[in-house]
Amino acid sequence: GIALAAYSFTLPQCRIHSKKSNSIIQSLGLDAFKLFKSRQMALFFVFSMLLGMSLQITNGYATPFITSFKGMAEYANTFGANNATLLTSFSQISEALCILLIPFFLHRFGIKKVMLIAMVAWVLRFGLFGIGDPGNGVWMFVLSMIVYGVAFDFFNVSGALFVEKETDKTIQASAQGLFMLMTNGIGASVGTLAAGKVVEHFCIWNSDGYLVGNWEAVWTIFASYALIVAVLFAIFFKYKHHPEKIAR
């Protein structure tokens, strides 16, 4: 932390472009909410919230799910069941590496298709959990971790770029904050509550401290949800790809 703080003093200065007098709404960044008047921006923020729900699902239940196999005799001694933290760490590695793929995909396919790829990746993320196991099917868990990088990076980066391209410079910072609010704020909160209800319906904590139950049904529901979101996004969100704008 101290090293990063020291490093920040070496960064170049950035001018702050702001009007001399701002209203209270502008000062608080609330002026970005006027973007909801635009159908395209409103749809984008709604889908951002829905994707934020998916993120919270995987953050909250990936590790308890993998660890739950320790409560099953046939998987109790498998490498996967006993190394949930190691398996989930592949998600962070994938997240870091997938950043490198984004410039190519954005230029080749455009913002909408990259967002759609991220949504399909969420379907695979949850679906692979539903059909995999820590024994012979552990490769499905590993593949799910790899897919996570695409699911997380592709939407967050392309979404931030979309906000930058489609909003006025005077409210870009507020608009980016609204994007984060919809994904990591409202979306994450709703996702926590909704996912909790689903898991509680199909699973229970046993005497050994493992969350056991019908996880296959849980992940099928989550995958179906992600698929519905992807289909609706493909149908209703309209955005033309202009490679020359991405290049700039």
Residue ranges of each PLM-predicted region?
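Helix-to-loop junctions at the C-terminal end of transmembrane segments
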Residues: 97-111, 199-200
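Pair of pore-lining "gating" transmembrane helices in MFS-fold secondary transporters
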Residues: 37-58, 146-147
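Juxtamembrane intracellular "pre-TM" segments in multi-pass secondary transporters
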Residues: 12-45, 71-72
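A membrane-interface helix-boundary motif in multi-pass transporters
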Residues: 197-226
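Intracellular juxtamembrane helix-capping segments at the cytosolic ends
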Residues: 154-168
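C-terminal ends and interior cores of transmembrane alpha-helices
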Residues: 120-134
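Short amphipathic helix-loop junctions that connect adjacent transmembrane helices
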Residues: 60-84
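C-terminal membrane-cytosol helix-exit motif in multi-pass small-molecule transporters
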Residues: 1-18, 232-237
